[in-house]
Swiss-Prot record:
<comment type="similarity">
    <text>Belongs to the RuBisCO small chain family.</text>
</comment>
<dbReference type="InterPro" id="IPR000894">
    <property type="entry name" value="RuBisCO_ssu_dom"/>
</dbReference>
<comment type="subunit">
    <text>Heterohexadecamer of 8 large and 8 small subunits.</text>
</comment>
<comment type="function">
    <text>RuBisCO catalyzes two reactions: the carboxylation of D-ribulose 1,5-bisphosphate, the primary event in carbon dioxide fixation, as well as the oxidative fragmentation of the pentose substrate. Both reactions occur simultaneously and in competition at the same active site. Although the small subunit is not catalytic it is essential for maximal activity.</text>
</comment>
<dbReference type="GO" id="GO:0009507">
    <property type="term" value="C:chloroplast"/>
</dbReference>
<feature type="transit peptide" description="Chloroplast">
    <location>
        <begin position="1"/>
        <end position="49"/>
    </location>
</feature>
<keyword id="KW-0150">Chloroplast</keyword>
<dbReference type="Pfam" id="PF00101">
    <property type="entry name" value="RuBisCO_small"/>
</dbReference>
<dbReference type="InterPro" id="IPR024680">
    <property type="entry name" value="RuBisCO_ssu_N"/>
</dbReference>
<keyword id="KW-0934">Plastid</keyword>
<keyword id="KW-0120">Carbon dioxide fixation</keyword>
<dbReference type="GO" id="GO:0016984">
    <property type="term" value="F:ribulose-bisphosphate carboxylase activity"/>
</dbReference>
<keyword id="KW-0602">Photosynthesis</keyword>
<dbReference type="GO" id="GO:0019253">
    <property type="term" value="P:reductive pentose-phosphate cycle"/>
</dbReference>
<keyword id="KW-0601">Photorespiration</keyword>
<keyword id="KW-0113">Calvin cycle</keyword>
<protein>
    <recommendedName>
        <fullName>Ribulose bisphosphate carboxylase small subunit, chloroplastic 7</fullName>
    </recommendedName>
</protein>
């Protein structure tokens, strides 16, 4: 024999929810045909004729900001200040032979693209002033005048490299 509360609950459930019978009809939604109007999109079509492709021969690129002219000491110090404001740890690396991307140990592109640079001393944990980094840069340039030298910023919380740019190149590059 069924108890009274079970009978009441069954009746209440049947009245509360209607069974699912399928998808709703599209007739309830207004249908408007949109015209493909591209006049509001940005276009540089009129300027394409005056654009040029950057010549790849004799103008190799390295890291971030490498498309710009060589940075001055003041500009480098500002980049290091940016790195320090973001609480990244500065580090210097140098390379004596291959300043460009090349593949010696691996044939597939990746984070390091088959190249490893030598670290100058240790990462500068606790560095708070760009003058400290610039002093280390000058020492590295004095020790290895024909080296590519880059400044890297590491985020020690996320444990990733956040910025990397060339600070010095050998003569002729």
């Amino acid at each position: 024999m069924a108890s009274i509360p079970a009978t009441v609950a069954t009746v209440a459930q049947a009245n509360m929810v209607a069974p699912f019978t399928g998808l709703k009809s599209n007739a309830a939604f207004p249908v408007t045909k949109k015209v493909n109007d591209f006049s509001t999109l940005a276009s540089n079509g009129g300027r394409v004729q005056c654009m040029k492709v950057w010549p790849p021969l004799g103008k190799k690129r390295y890291e971030t900001l490498s498309y710009l002219p060589n940075l001055t000491e003041v500009q480098l110090a500002k980049e290091v200040d940016y790195l320090l404001r973001n609480k990244w740890v500065p580090c210097l690396e140098f390379e004596l032979e291959h300043g460009f991307v090349y593949r010696e140990n691996a044939r597939s592109p990746g984070y390091y693209d088959g190249r490893y640079w030598t670290m100058w001393k240790l990462p500068m944990f606790g560095c708070t002033d760009s003058a400290q980094v610039m002093k280390e840069l000058q020492e590295c340039k004095k020790e290895y005048p024909q080296a590519w030298i880059r400044i890297i910023g590491f985020d020690n919380v996320r444990q990733v490299q956040c910025i990397s740019f060339i600070a010095s190149k050998p003569d002729g590059f």
